[in-house]
Curated annotation (Swiss-Prot):
Belongs to the UPF0178 family. It holds the Pfam family DUF188. InterPro entries: UPF0178. PANTHER family: UPF0178 PROTEIN YAII (PTHR35146:SF1). Disulfide bonds: none annotated. This is UPF0178 protein Gmet_1725.
Length: 155
């Protein structure tokens, strides 16, 4: 298992929560971004800088993530791609993308984009809050516990 982070837009506090979980559970993390990222003191965290361009980081993650991996992303099309291969995707606000909800989330995203382009809706998501951070930490903990349990061979 590996944790992939779509790092360009991921809040720093979320990355820090993931790094702590990585250290505690000895799970490797791979940050993928279009720009250079800060170096990390642990061998468990790898940073990959991809070329500039639309969806280049998303494409890299989708091409390299395995079904047993966890992807942290706010990008709904990337989450849909991960779920389609049987992978697990978690939003930085703690929402788990599933086969049951990712299609609806994608449709809602597309609708909101059209409404914004038409000037009918302004702004984007609400500012990242302490509640979002706590929800993410709780969701990540539950999810990693479940994924680790599912990976253990039954004896």
């Amino acid at each position: 298992m590996k944790i992939w982070i779509d790092a360009d837009a991921c809040p720093r506090v979320i990355k820090e929560i993931v790094f702590r979980a990585s250290e505690r559970l000895r799970i490797p993390v791979c940050l993928v971004a279009n720009k250079n990222l800060a170096k990390h003191a642990t061998h468990l965290v790898e940073s990959i800088v991809v070329g500039e361009g639309f969806d280049v980081a998303d494409d890299y993650i989708a091409d390299h993530a395995a079904p047993e991996d966890l992807v942290i992303t706010a990008d709904i099309p990337l989450a849909a791609r991960i779920v389609a291969i049987g992978g697990v995707a978690l939003d930085p606000r703690g929402e788990l993308y599933t086969e049951e909800n990712v299609g609806e989330r994608l449709s809602m995203r597309d609708l909101m984009m059209e409404l914004r382009e038409g000037g009918l809706v302004q702004g984007g998501p609400s500012q990242f809050s302490l509640t979002d951070r706590q929800r993410f930490a709780s969701s990540l903990d539950r999810l990693l516990t479940r994924l680790i349990r599912e990976m253990r061979p039954v004896s």
